[in-house]
Amino acid sequence: AVMGRNLALNIESRGYTVSVFNRSREKTEEVIAENPGKKLVPHYTVKEFVESLETPRRILLMVKAGAGTDSAIDSLKPYLDKGDIIIDGGNTFFQDTIRRNRELSADGFNFIGTGVSGGEEGALKGPSIMPGGQKEAYELVAPILEQIAARAEDGEPCVAYIGADGAGHYVKMVHNGIEYGDMQLIAEAYALLKGGLALSNEELATTFTEWNQGELSSYLIDITKDIFTKKDEEGKYLVDVILDEAANKGTGKWTSQSSLDLGEPLSLITESVFARYISSLKDQRVAASKVLTGPQAQPASDKAEFIEKVRRALYLGKIVSYAQGFSQLRAASNEYSWDLNYGEIAKIFRAGCIIRAQFLQKITDAYEENAGIANLLLAPYFKQIADEYQQALRDVVAYAVQNGIPVPTFSAAIAYYDSYRSAVLPANLIQAQRDYFGAHTYKRT
């Protein structure tokens, strides 16, 4: 409800009159009461709401993904005319969007599945918007979407037509998967700085403030520096009293499931999903900590050197995560005939969304130099960073393993990097085993 309200207020602030409807009369009345003088027109029946709109109607749905979206669409259909446009701005599974697009197209309606990133504040002030559906329908809503979207530093709106049917929601799903990876990498950096150097919260905030001035400059690093020094009403550091169980809404899982369907090695992001799952086993972990032995973390010898190694490992890990994510976008584009523009996608992530970061421009640059590049690690800038930073990543992972600090995404990053650069892998033995017990046959070199 908050996302819908904030998007309505965002649209209204651009000079539009906005019809609003919620199943709950009270919620509709509440929005109107809280926003006196705004050009928000309340409606209390679906019929009245639909009939208030000029044709072709442009209806933005912000409902919980799943059955709720289908029932909302079903309630609208009796009152729609051919050519009307429904925009689904929820966190919808892309296969559902493909299905709804097909069904609504058959009835003569347009359906635009749209990823919206930036949270409640982004919805109000300017989100990153990822629309997919009929191109001609997108053209009819593009002026509004461009006005309400976030603006990058160069003034460009963070919205672009992504592709047919489920393309927009797919890109939003991968965005969320990358977000999982970014957050877990940062959490592991935090664990290393606490475990290896016993940094205080103030020192952590100072370190992250410095990191945010350079290559790692991003929304997530920026908010993390603030989180470290936030105190509760008792004067305790808030982060230190928050239970170490990370919840999830399932979008990271969807990204990993899709990687398995496509045969894409999305190892880092998938490890970040698993890390949340193992965090939720709190009671088991507490019990296991009293039974299972392991090394006690020994302090790192050189403080400044260790901090720099962790910074480099974090940046290279981030690059590997995005390389995997964009490789999966390419596989999905081929599978679903979307013709995705990867440089354009990186561009619309530059502002408004949770993964906004300075280095996204480097991704756009890489695709502008070579649109057909198979993997971002092969682009000159990212190859150079890998050359320079891989030793730090290796050292940090080795330190973590020796000292019993779990770093699943850092470990996944170096394993993927080494696998990807290996001309020969031991998979020949696996294939021989498969042929031995199942006559699966094999190819000769």
Swiss-Prot record:
Keyword line: Gluconate utilization, NADP, Oxidoreductase, Pentose shunt
One Gene Ontology MF term: phosphogluconate dehydrogenase (decarboxylating) activity
UniProt pathway annotation: Carbohydrate degradation; pentose phosphate pathway; D-ribulose 5-phosphate from D-glucose 6-phosphate (oxidative stage): step 3/3
EC number: 1.1.1.44
Keyword NADP: yes
The keyword Flavoprotein belongs to this UniProt entry's keyword annotation: no
GO BP field: D-gluconate metabolic process; organic acid catabolic process; pentose-phosphate shunt
Pfam families hit by this protein: 6PGD, NAD_binding_2
Reaction catalysis annotation: 6-phospho-D-gluconate + NADP(+) = D-ribulose 5-phosphate + CO2 + NADPH
Taxonomy, superkingdom: Bacteria
SUPFAM superfamilies assigned: 6-phosphogluconate dehydrogenase C-terminal domain-like, NAD(P)-binding Rossmann-fold domains
Residues engaged in binding substrate: 91, 117-119, 175-176, 180, 249, 276, 434, 440
List of catalytic residues: 172 (proton acceptor), 179 (proton donor)
Binding site for NADP(+): 1-4, 22-24, 63-65, 91
Biological role stated in the UniProt entry: Catalyzes the oxidative decarboxylation of 6-phosphogluconate to ribulose 5-phosphate and CO(2), with concomitant reduction of NADP to NADPH.
Subunit structure, interactors included: Homodimer.
Record-stated family: Belongs to the 6-phosphogluconate dehydrogenase family.
Name of the molecule in the record: 6-phosphogluconate dehydrogenase, decarboxylating
